[in-house]
Amino acid sequence: EQWLPQVCTRIEALGSYRERIVTTAIGDNQASFLGAAGNENNTLLVNMGTGGQISVLSDQYFTAEGIEARPFLHGTYLLAGASLCGGKAYALLEKFFREFVKEATGQEKPLYKTLEKLAGDGKASCTGRENRKKLQIETTFDGTRVHPEQTGSITNLSTDNFTPAAFVYGTLEGMSRELYQMY
């Protein structure tokens, strides 16, 4: 008696259930990439959930620190990098502001709409500004997969950028930058 299924190299039909074809499984990253981006080479997909993920389709196997080569369709690979604090960093920022507002006013309500407005204001105030004058937020609050001991940081604080808008925009930029550096 066989306890584990046979390993296969492609999606195969296994049978049907309620008149639907049942196939071999693929990983969640592979399934989301296929559904969102298809199977074109050099296509890049960014997912932002609790963590963040950047995936690119390649016909060549490749590994680097922090990058996994995951099998995909027809002998291709998804090169995937993942951050531990993707959307979690934004949720942490919202919680920070919500706790401040509750302390100041006694009211507690979600502030994501306010953060969205502040992000736009932050982008407008940062556009064209030199990097050394922009608030830099590293959103590695829970470390990284390669360096779990790493922590987040805020640098380049000045009287010009010590604003809620700069913090919101800087957090979003930090979330994006962490994934971009993997690419």
Which residue ranges define each predicted feature?
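Active-site gating loop/helix substructures
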Residues: 1-2
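Active-site core segments that coordinate phosphate-bearing ligands/cofactors
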Residues: 8, 14-183
